[in-house]
From Swiss-Prot:
Presence of keyword ATP-binding: yes
The species this protein was found in: Synechococcus sp. (strain JA-3-3Ab) (Cyanobacteria bacterium Yellowstone A-Prime)
Gene from which the chain derives: coaE
Protein name, UniProt field: Dephospho-CoA kinase
GO biological process, any: coenzyme A biosynthetic process
Primary location: cytoplasm
């Protein structure tokens, strides 16, 4: 089975690539959506978060103020690490369920390889699935995928998209960018690099080319220098 690990920098266009893949009939698991589910009303994780931060992350109606929570954790690495320690196990469990539902198996929980593994999970199911994991490298989850795709754009585009999409201040944008690996390092470790600095049509063409290239044998892909899809 071909398991695409889709990642990149914040606001580089990962969700756009995911939608393109879905139009090609490829199932996509969204780790960000799973993280939001972890903080849903009634979840024990949400209760622990509220116990830790209290009214500081609640709006006047009592609902969870995600932007205020973001201000706290992106300003303090220790708080961000605590929050990730609450959410990541939940997300990994949901990703594991997704893979099993499509006939694959996730790596052992103790396995943490620094590079993508040549041992691709086997199974009878959909021939290609995608795990969209924004923090794939930061969470050391490279070995969950048989190949890694990194979506890039220019730094100026990243900042512009964050300002328009999330209504963040310049300081908030820089804090979020600083919390992730440099985009250049992610691209260096990728099997496929998708340049999303152009048009949607150009991005779609790159995705089609990457899907067709499929440089594998026997259901696995070995670490190779990244392929830049133009």
């Amino acid at each position: 089975m071909r398991i695409i690990g889709l990642t990149g920098g914040i606001a580089t266009g990962k969700s756009t690539v995911a939608r393109i893949l879905e139009r090609h009939g490829i199932p996509v698991a969204d780790a960000d959506q799973m993280a939001r589910q972890a903080l849903a009303v009634g979840s024990p994780i949400r209760e622990r978060v509220l116990q830790r931060y209290g009214r500081a992350i609640q709006d006047p109606s009592g609902a969870l103020d995600r932007r205020q929570l973001g201000r706290i954790v992106f300003a303090d690495a220790a708080e961000r690490a605590w929050l990730e320690a609450q959410i990541h196990p939940f997300v990994k469990a949901r990703l594991r369920e997704f893979l099993e539902a499509h006939g694959a198996s996730a790596p052992p929980e103790e396995a943490t390889e620094a590079r993508p593994s040549c041992q691709c999970p086997h199974g009878e199911g959909h021939p290609t699935v995608c795990l969209m994991i924004p923090l794939l490298f930061e969470a050391h989850m490279e070995n969950w995928a048989s190949e890694i795709w990194v979506v890039t754009c220019t730094p100026e585009q990243q900042r512009q998209r964050l300002a328009q999409r999330d209504l963040l201040t310049a300081a908030e944008i820089e804090a979020r960018l600083a919390s992730q690996w440099p985009l250049e390092e992610k691209a260096r470790r990728a099997h496929v690099v998708l340049d999303n600095s152009g048009s949607l049509a150009q991005l779609e063409a790159q995705v089609r080319q990457a899907l067709g290239a499929h440089p594998r044998e026997g259901g696995a892909i070995c670490p190779t220098p990244p392929s830049r899809i133009e």
